[in-house]
Regions:
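Post-HEXXH active-site segment of zinc metalloproteases
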Residues: 88-119
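Charged/polar positions on well-ordered alpha helices
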Residues: 85, 116-119, 123, 127
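Non-Sec secretion/translocation targeting segments of pathogen effectors
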Residues: 1-3
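Short alpha-helical catalytic segment bearing the HExxH-like zincin motif
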Residues: 73-81
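Short secondary-structure boundary/hinge segments and terminal tails
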Residues: 55-57, 95, 143
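Short, positively charged and aromatic/hydrophobic N-terminal segments
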Residues: 7-20
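Long, well-structured alpha-helical subdomains associated
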Residues: 25, 29, 69-74, 122-152
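Active-site scaffold of zinc-dependent metalloenzymes
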Residues: 18-32, 36-72, 85-89
């Protein structure tokens, strides 16, 4: 079943088994399993869009870039964003740092936060029974972390 509910703030996105820019893209089994879990447990919708990001517990949305392969880097990116969902206030310490006053400290703890989200995402995958090719996982993780390490 395909749901085509329009998001007013995001006119290019439709919900669930996803109509995106006129193209229907059904979620693969493992991606859907994670998406369904997030909806049931946290009320979080997983949507395809122009970015990959967890929009926060208030907005209850995770966007995965529409060009991602939802069986590989898209799934791993989703699991990483689940890692952010599972983070505690302590894990998000960098958000308490004034980036203008202490930019190096902010960027360092932001980098640590990203590593933590990857770790939590992998543990979550294991708990939910999601199959992960560890070599592919590490490749996607390292590509992502590299973008943060350049800021250090």
């Amino acid at each position: 079943m395909l749901v085509q509910q329009n998001y007013h703030n995001f006119p290019w996105i439709y919900k669930k088994n996803c109509l995106y820019l006129g193209m229907i893209k059904k979620y693969p089994k493992q991606f859907k399993k994670v998406s369904d879990y997030l909806k049931e447990k946290f009320g979080i919708d997983v949507l395809l869009g122009q970015i990959t990001a967890f929009m926060g517990h208030k907005n209850k949305k995770i966007f995965i870039h529409h060009n991602h392969n939802l069986e590989k880097n898209g799934l791993y990116s989703l699991l990483h964003e689940v890692g952010h969902v599972l983070q505690t206030d302590e894990d998000n310490y960098f958000k308490t740092i004034d980036e203008d006053k202490e930019p190096k400290k902010f960027k360092f703890y932001q980098y640590i936060n990203e590593i933590n989200a990857w770790e939590k995402g992998l543990l979550f995958a294991n708990e939910l029974g999601i199959r992960v090719n560890i070599e592919d996982w590490v490749k996607v993780q390292n590509e992502s972390l590299y973008t943060y390490s350049k800021k250090l």
